[in-house]
Each structure stands twice: as structure tokens, then as C-alpha cells.
Amino acid sequence: MNKKILQILEYDKVKEQFMNALTTAQGQKELSDLVPLTDKDKIQLLFDEVADFRLLTQENGLLNLGKTNDLTEILRRLELEASLSGKEFVEIKKVIQLGINIQRFFDEAENVETPSLNITLEKLVDLSGLIKKLEIFDNAGSLYDNASLELMHIRASIKSHQSEIRKIMQEMLTKNLSSLSENVITIRNDRQVLPVKAENKNKIAGVVHDMSASGQTLYIEPNAVVSLNNKLNQKRIEERQEITRIYRELAEELKPYSFDIRQNAWLIGHIDFVRAKYLYLTANKASLPALTNDKDIILFAARHPLIDAKMVVANDIKFDKTLNTIVITGPNTGGKTITLKTVGLLTILAQSGLPILAEDGSRIHLFDDIFADIGDEQSIEQSLSTFSSHMTNIVQILAQADENSLVLFDELGAGTDPKEGAALAIAILENLRKRNVKTMASTHYPELKAYGVETQQVINASMEFNIDKMQPTYHLQLGVPGRSNALEISRRLGLPETIISEAGQQISESEHDVNQMIEKLEEKTREVIESSRNIKKIERENQSLHKDLTKVYNQINRERDFELEKAQKEAQEVVKKASLEAQEILKNLNDKAALKPHEIIAARKELEGLAPTIDFSKNKVLKKAKAQRGLKQGAEVNVTSYGQRGKLIRLEKDGRWTVQMGSITTRLSEEEFEVIETPEQIQAKTKNVSKKVTSKVKAQLDLRGMRYEEAELELDNYIDQALLANLIQITIVHGIGTGVIREMVQKKLQKHRHIKSYEYAPINAGGSGATIAILK
């Protein structure tokens, strides 16, 4: 895309609005290098990343990123084996740690899938092994004492020498206060000295390191600490040498990973940029438009991003594929230029993968290039008039624009004789229309109103003007040509009625009729716009309610799953405890050679007491299951409490069954035995299930005519049924239409773990209107 349009539409100023949300140097670099794209798949991926991040944040909170600086020069020097400073090692550490934190955040994220972001995350290299090597630095870039054993010993010696020197110096300071100019110990040439009055220099034996500017004070190192200071300086030299050695070894260990560190830095920067887009999206009530190749520009509540949010006026702009040209007529200062810039700028932002200031449902066609003649671009150096300057620009546009270009003209034909200017404007627009070039033009020439009415694929538009307040509203009115309000405005400003009346007589009857017709059109348009706004308001409220309900539903599901898991664990603990106690009781029984009847009854009661007393009488699921057990007289059962087979004799009044086990007859509750199914029952049940599943599942599902949510639910159910029926291949008919249902189907198939592969149907079987899937 040509650079001139980026300057005209102030593209870089909009990019600056994202800069404050970025925390990494790499993210800022990616923003600076950003230009509009024309590859639909690449742009869609950028939008999908933001959509993924939005879902991730809604479920798991905002990802926090620390500030990082540019590693380009640091890594270049690392690869050249040049020495690095402690602060530079810390910068490397920050990037590595940030990569680890990001990976951990995504790994621990719940209730959301981020397939688009995963493409970036999968490229992140795990460098956690290097973090331990870099933990020897504090945040300022200084080495900790335990960076090496040698460094620890050296610094311990330094502290010992410093302490000893400080003690001696403090004693000398106290003893020689009268000889000192100040009651302090100071530093000269890295050695501790005393500020001695010049006349008392012979009272303190030592080495003079400095003199005050006045010559009244000498800075003397007492002989008592000279030797210790020498030792201290030697240890400091050893400390520097050890630090250099540690730096060198660490650099050698990091060098093989320089490529991975550099790649991680850029990947982190990209995630930072995605995060910045999300923050812009939410802070500005922006949206991610649908991308099209059908020449649709549909913008709902479009706003110019460089106008104050409190002042900007939102406009619906429907420049669909049925239209080739929009002609905005009417007086100046009504917002025509801003409308042109808004369309161009939002298109460029969308093609850059950035959110746009428009409501959901907006659609943007991808253009190869955008051209504009907006504002007074005359060149003083070339001594061109305003008209010549514009015409020079227009000539270049006509030479370069094609059917996949968007052209914007502001005050087309201005700067010359009105009749000739209008004629030129019509001819230029007609040339572009015949070449199928999408064009928006503003003009104040009334002749272009007739062109907009009489010409196919061309529509008039105007900017609304509030007569009562005598000021423009900046609302775009599609289908309504602009009209002059000069007479009415003059009347309200106090111009004598006689003058207004005489002026009105100068206007032809046909022109007067046209103005009345336009006025009625404006009223109807206002009514339609107001009705449309109310409908959109209700839609937004419904969408908000749907989001809230979905969030509550997901929360309930999470809490339910948590409670089920908790109950399951508790049940397992109860069973485990009961099992251990039962084993202990059985062991005690086995230890006794002979048992008396009352001991057997007591032991059995003890076993029964291990089971928790839960009332299942109101449980519908258990009732249904019990009814399906088919308990009847003569049925074979397995008595679980005795581990023996038996036969049901009769059902007693208390709900228990009399069961015969060999020669023993006893009464048991239904929970104490299980019905043993005969081979015939098992075979009949299997046939039943097989017949029930396979008889109802077809190999084709037709989603045409369904709403998105309805189609999505129908597809989920159908795949489950197809899997139960052991189908190998299925066909989903979704039609071509807008492509929304088709994209939903393919995303579902891509994510489903039981789908082996999928592709569009052959041409003779529906082509891109149907998808064939192979089941695993």
C-alpha cells in the first residue's frame, strides 16, 4: 500500500495509541514496523489472536508482562564473544523469565482454548535451565556473594578488612578531634582518610592523599591503616578478576542459546502486542471486523480514532457490493471530510490486524491499495494553484487505481469554474465507475445530485444539519442528497423577510420542489436511523445478557464439577474406611473357632453400620434403574453380602425379598443382591441398543437455513450419534452463503478429537457448500 495514503490518513498517529499499552521493546518494534496487509489469512490470524486473548482474559484474568529492553545489541556482542555487563545479563534474564511466566500462564489457564495464540506459544523455547545460572545477579546487575565460592571468600575478607580499618580510624578520629577540620572519616583514592588541619599535619603520621582548595585541610591516611588499606585494595582487585571470570564463563554458557533467546524475545513481543490490541479493544469499545473479498464496506457506529471520544459522532456506513460510488453533497463544515477519512482509516487499520472503532458485525473488504485526494496539498515550490495541485494528484490516482482499489475524493472538482468543476467531477467519477473502482467523493456542486440519482451503482449521501440549533450534527444520511439551508439560516439570524422572500423568488420552482423532497427524505431517514439505533441498542443489551448468562452457566458448571469431584473423593474415603473396618471385622470372625448366634448377629449389624445411611427413596434415577432391574419371583441373584448365588422366592411387605441360597433361606433388601442376567437377556439388550442407534442416524446432516447457535448444537449432537452408530464417513451440508456456518463447521471438525480428516465435497456433490468428514 502506498505510503502517501498512510500520511494523509495519519496512520502513525493511530499506531501511537497502542504504544502506551506495550511493555516490551520487541512489542514496540513490531508496532513501529506494522504496515497494512492484503493477505486475508494473515490478517484473520491476527484478529483470531486478539479474540483468543479476550476469551483467555475473561476466564483467567489479564496476563501481566514485565518491562524488557531491546536485546539486539546485547545478543550481537554475546555472539561476538565481547564482554557483557551485569545489567546486560539481567536484561537477558528478564526475557527468559518472562517467557517462562507466559508459558506457565497459558498452561494453567482453564476453560478456554487458544488455537491461534498456540501457534506462537509452540515456538517458545523452554530456557528454564538458564534461569538458575542467571539467578546470581540482583535486579541492579550486581553479583550476589554466593555467585562463586571464591567470590564469597574474597568479599568476606573485604568486609573483615573494612571493619578493622573502620575501627582503627574511629579510634584515631576520637583521639585527634582538635587536630581535624571536620569530625568525619572520608574517602580519597579509594582509601579511608582523615581531614587534618594544615597546621597539625605533623601530629598525625601518614600519607597525604589530597588537599582542599583553600590549602587549609590535608587528607591523611594514618600509617596505622596503610597496610590494611593495601590489603583491602588487593582484595578488591581479586574481586574484579573473579567477577570478570564469572561473566566470561556465563557468556560462554549463554552463547549457544543466543538464537533461542532472540526468538523468544520476539515471540514475547508479539504476545505483548496482542495484549495491547486487546486493551485498546476493551478501552475504546472497538471490534474485530469480518474480512471480505466481495467489495463490502459495512461499518456500524464507525468513529474516527483521532477525535476525542466525548466529541466524536458515530456513523453507520453501508457501502456494500451493490454500490460502486457514494457522492456526499451539501455545504462545507458538515463532516464530509472526516467521513471520508474514517472509511479510509478504518479500512487501513483492519488490514493491519488492528481493532477498529466500530460495532460488532462490521465488514471490511481487503483492498490492494487506497488512494485519496484530501485537503489542500498544493506545492509552493512548484507554484501550483489549488486546482492544479489537486488535478495533478487525481491524474496519478486515475493512472494507478484498479478494481481492487478504494479511492477517496474530498471536494472533487473544486478550485475552478463551478460548471466546469462539476462537469469534470462527473466525468472522473464515471471513469472510475466504469472501471469498477470503489469510490467515495464529497462535493458541494448540486449537479452531482442528479448524477447520484440517475446513475446505477451510485448513491447520494449528505451530512445532517440541525436547523433549530443551526449547526451540523455530523450524522451521515445515505440516500439523501445534501441541500442548502441558506435561506432558513439567514431568517433565523435575523435577515429581513423581504430580502429572504426576494431571494426565494430567484430560485426556480423545480429547485424549490427538489429541496422540499430532500427535506422529506431527511425526515424519513432520521426516523429509520432512530429506529435502527433502538434495535441495535436492544441487540447490544441481549448480547450483554447472553454473555453474562454464559459466564454464570460456565461458573455453575465449574462449581458442579468441583462438588462432584469433592463428593467422589469423600465417597472413596468412606468406602476405603468401610473396607478396612470390614476386613478387621472379618479377621476377628475368622480368629474365633466357634460363634454363638448372638455373636453372628452382632457382627452382621456391625458390618451393616459401616454403610452410610443415605435416603435414596426420592432419587428418580435410582427408581428408574430399580424398575429396569426386572426383579421377579424365581430370578437368579448374586447375594453380595454372602458372596453366593440364590433365587428370589417372594417379595415381603416390608420391601425385602425372601432369598433361598441352597438350604438357607433369609430376607434381604434389594441393595444386598444383584440380578444375574441370562444369555438371552444380554443378547436381546445388545440387539435392542444396536437397532436403536443405527436405525436413526443418516450419513448426511443439512444445516442450511439454521441460525448459528442452532447449527452448532445440531452439529455436536449429530457427530455424537454418528460415532455411536460407528459411521465411517459423514457429510455436512452448510451451503455457501456468507460463510459463517461453513467456518463454524470446519473449526468444529478441526478441534474434534474423533475426526480423522475433512474436505469440501466434490463439485458434483455440493462443492464448497458441503464438507465430508472421516471419523476415527
Curated annotation (Swiss-Prot):
The keyword DNA-binding applies. Its EC number is 3.1.-.-, 3.6.4.-. GO terms for molecular function: ATP binding; ATP hydrolysis activity; ATP-dependent DNA damage sensor activity; endonuclease activity; mismatched DNA binding; ribosomal large subunit binding; rRNA binding. ATP binds at G330, P331, N332, T333, G334, G335, K336, T337. Keywords: ATP-binding, DNA-binding, Endonuclease, Hydrolase, Nuclease, Nucleotide-binding, RNA-binding, rRNA-binding. GO terms for biological process: mismatch repair; negative regulation of DNA recombination; rescue of stalled ribosome. InterPro entries: DNA_mismatch_repair_MutS_C (IPR000432), DNA_mismatch_repair_MutS_core (IPR007696), DNA_mismatch_repair_MutS_sf (IPR036187), MSSS (IPR046893), MutS (IPR045076), MutS2 (IPR005747), P-loop_NTPase (IPR027417), Smr_dom (IPR002625). Pfam families: MSSS, MutS_V, Smr. It is an enzyme of class 3 (hydrolase). Residues 701-776 form the Smr domain. The keyword Nuclease applies. SMART domains: MUTSac (SM00534), MUTSd (SM00533), SMR (SM00463). CDD domains: ABC_MutS2. Homodimer. Binds to stalled ribosomes, contacting rRNA. Endonuclease that is involved in the suppression of homologous recombination and thus may have a key role in the control of bacterial genetic diversity. Acts as a ribosome collision sensor, splitting the ribosome into its 2 subunits. Detects stalled/collided 70S ribosomes which it binds and splits by an ATP-hydrolysis driven conformational change. Acts upstream of the ribosome quality control system (RQC), a ribosome-associated complex that mediates the extraction of incompletely synthesized nascent chains from stalled ribosomes and their subsequent degradation. Probably generates substrates for RQC. Belongs to the DNA mismatch repair MutS family. MutS2 subfamily. HAMAP family: MutS2. This is Endonuclease MutS2. It comes from Lactococcus lactis subsp. cremoris (strain MG1363). The gene is mutS2.
